Amino acid sequence: MNSSASTKERILTAAEALFAQRGFEGASLRQLTAAAGVNLAAVNYHFGSKDNLVEEVFKRRLDQLNARRLAALKQVSGQPETTLEDVLAAFIRPALDLSHDGGGGLFMRVLARAFAEHDDSLRKFLSDNYGHVMRQFTAEFARLLPQLTKEELYWRIDLVTGALTHAMSGFGMIQRKSDVSEVTHREQTAAHLIRFAAAGLSAP
């Protein structure tokens, strides 16, 4: 990694930690430059503005996450033998992998901040850049659940997404036991969540 790319990555990592801790409004550029060990000119050079920096923090994680989701969905989409659990696995497993991958857990706190702070510009950014992912999953859910109205399906998908976000946060009642590996615990979480979500989506 060259010096410029290394500086940009360092700024993104510091910003992610600060946004998780202080929120988007609470984290100042002065705090960011101190945490990243750079000057303000470097932040402006790589990102131009704080808003652009916030967006790049999201893109760094979500571009990869959603590429994995869509690749998994492509493997099962439209096939007559595809089950609801197959589509849910494509949606859930990459997200759980992210939450346990390096700084992914920290990013989940940033994502939670985004929803909690009701930032309209950030919501628009997420919708504009990643809304197509949810639309593709929703279309496949609708194919498998033709008995549901569009409104009812949206309600259920929204609640499934909430359950996934909770599972990714790591703050649930079920914590990993000391004799269970991280990989095994993640697989247990995925299996339980997929079964739970499938039951909720397909309920009468």
Task: Label every PLM stretch briefly.
Residues 8-13, 47-70, 74-77, 81, ...:
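An amphipathic alpha-helix adjacent to DNA-recognition modules
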